């Protein structure tokens, strides 16, 4: 990865290179939070499903479900585990939204300032190769501002 950034020296100056590296870091941070959110959502769904299955198997009659839940601490533990997993997924969802906003703002800033970042005509042609590399290596679209 370092050699890739060294290749950019011929196409960009140091501040532009720093902006692109910051953009890649924000993209990785956003993807990390998205993966954590998915993981915890699945964990909460599995916990809820197991809780429902255990209650349906153990409960003799539908009228006694509440009594069955309150009389065994095992069910309370599973309820707490489900609530914890859901709250953690909610926390990571908020972090994901914030990191996506930060990533999108920096991406739009680079797109809007591209005329300042590559002012000379020969550098402007090199901009295309930088944008192409960012699109194919990191899946970051610098051609358009839309998400």
Curated annotation (Swiss-Prot):
Membrane topology, from the record: Multi-pass membrane protein
InterPro entries on file: Uncharacterised_YpbF_TM
Keywords, sorted A to Z: Cell membrane, Membrane, Transmembrane, Transmembrane helix
Keyword Membrane: yes
Keyword Transmembrane: yes
Cystine bridges: none
Transmembrane segments: 42-62, 64-84
Location within or outside the cell: Cell membrane
Gene Ontology CC: plasma membrane
Protein known as: Uncharacterized protein YpbF
UniProt organism field: Bacillus subtilis (strain 168)
């Amino acid at each position: 990865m370092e050699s890739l950034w060294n290749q950019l020296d011929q196409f960009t100056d140091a501040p532009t290179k720093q902006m692109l590296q910051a953009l890649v870091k924000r993209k990785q941070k956003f993807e990390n939070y998205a993966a954590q959110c998915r993981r915890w959502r699945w964990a909460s769904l599995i916990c809820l499903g197991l809780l429902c299955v255990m209650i349906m198997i153990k409960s003799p009659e539908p009228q006694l479900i509440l009594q069955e839940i309150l009389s065994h601490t095992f069910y309370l533990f599973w309820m707490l585990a489900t609530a914890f997993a859901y709250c953690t997924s909610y926390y990571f969802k908020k972090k994901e939204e914030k990191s996506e906003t930060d990533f999108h703002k920096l991406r739009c800033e680079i797109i809007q300032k591209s005329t300042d970042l590559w002012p000379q005509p020969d550098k402007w042609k090199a901009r295309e190769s930088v944008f192409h590399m960012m699109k194919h290596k990191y899946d970051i679209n610098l051609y358009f501002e839309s998400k």
